[in-house]
């Protein structure tokens, strides 16, 4: 039943997107949405710091006129996925419902309680230009702890954990790393047999005026995964609600998994406000870097490329 509802909603949104005018004036600071030009700037910034991500044109017949022909969307391919979500060690105590009154039951932040420290005032947020090929991250007041690598925090944790509210505290990502630790040694034969790969894409959604993530998976022999197979690699709290199956706007079938963008602008707006309260300013060019941390809560076992360090 939920799949039927999602299909109907998807068709309605296709029409709505077609009728929605292209956003021309920046409203990033006020509402968290971005223009196509701002999407391009954020995409260029991502490609510069994380070169496994690249711009792509897609099918000529599906080119969007408000984006350059050779920069229709971003993609990264052959991203490893070593374990299924059910093999991760987490419990209900680690979850928190975000926005309970949204009519859909709220957004479940699976590792909400894994972060144990926050920072008070932010003068600026800058990206450390370090190796982005590794999928570990540190969010800290400085970069003295280069050897202390842990899993990245997701975007909701920035706002819900009271990011930037306490004195001289460092976000401890080591607990997230421990929470996501597979039950079996990744070096074992069983782990190798279970390794999958994913192609990830980031498009600009004209209706929601935000980025949107798409993913499609393959097994060990590079054979396409079924929808049910891909659902095994997605947090079960998000399957068929936050994550739906839809056609990629720039590529031919088959349909792909997509992380619905209806909450992205709202969450980004809260982060912008939090940073501003600390005396800092969040540049729109950082959008996709934060976005990739945000969606990690939805696909925690897919080890895509994101920045290692944010200096607060």
From Swiss-Prot:
Per the record, where are the segments of Acidic residues compositional bias? 141-156
Q: Which PANTHER family match?
A: UBIQUITIN-LIKE-CONJUGATING ENZYME ATG3
- What is the annotated role of this protein in its UniProt record? E2 conjugating enzyme that catalyzes the covalent conjugation of the C-terminal Gly of ATG8-like proteins (GABARAP, GABARAPL1, GABARAPL2 or MAP1LC3A) to the amino group of phosphatidylethanolamine (PE)-containing lipids in the membrane resulting in membrane-bound ATG8-like proteins which is one of the key steps in the development of autophagic isolation membranes during autophagosome formation. Cycles back and forth between binding to ATG7 for loading with the ATG8-like proteins and binding to E3 enzyme, composed of ATG12, ATG5 and ATG16L1 to promote ATG8-like proteins lipidation.
Q: Where in the cell is it found?
A: Cytoplasm
The text the record gives for the protein's domains is: The N-terminal region works in concert with its geometry-selective amphipathic helix (AH) to promote LC3-PE conjugation activity only on the target membrane.
**In which domain of life is the source organism classified?**
Eukaryota
Question: InterPro entries this protein is in?
Answer: Atg3/Atg10
Sorted keywords for this record are: Autophagy, Cytoplasm, Isopeptide bond, Protein transport, Transferase, Transport, Ubl conjugation, Ubl conjugation pathway
The protein, known as: Ubiquitin-like-conjugating enzyme ATG3
Q: Which organism is it from?
A: Xenopus tropicalis
Q: What is the lineage of its organism?
A: Eukaryota, Metazoa, Chordata, Craniata, Vertebrata
Q: How does it assemble?
A: Homdimer. Interacts with ATG7; this interaction forms an E1-E2 complex that is essential for the transfer of GABARAP thioester from ATG7 to ATG3 and disrupts interaction with the E3 enzyme complex. Interacts with ATG12; this interaction is ATG7-dependent, essential for phosphatidylethanolamine (PE)-conjugated ATG8-like proteins formation and also mediates the autoconjugation of ATG12 on ATG3. Interacts with the E3 enzyme complex composed of 4 sets of ATG12-ATG5 and ATG16L1 (400 kDa); this interaction disrupts interaction with ATG7 and promotes ATG8-like proteins lipidation.
> Could you tell me the Gene Ontology terms of the biological process aspect for this record?
autophagosome assembly; autophagy; mitochondrial fragmentation involved in apoptotic process; protein transport
The keyword Oxidoreductase is assigned to this record: no
Catalytic residues (positions):
262 (glycyl thioester intermediate)
Where does it sit, as one GO cellular component term? cytoplasm
What gene codes for this chain? atg3
In residue numbers, the region (Disordered) covers 136-156
What Gene3D superfamilies does UniProt report for this protein, alphabetically? 3.30.1460.50
Q: What is its EC number?
A: 2.3.2.-
**What is the residue range of the motif LIR motif?**
104-110
Into which family does the record put it? Belongs to the ATG3 family.
Q: What class of enzyme is it?
A: transferase
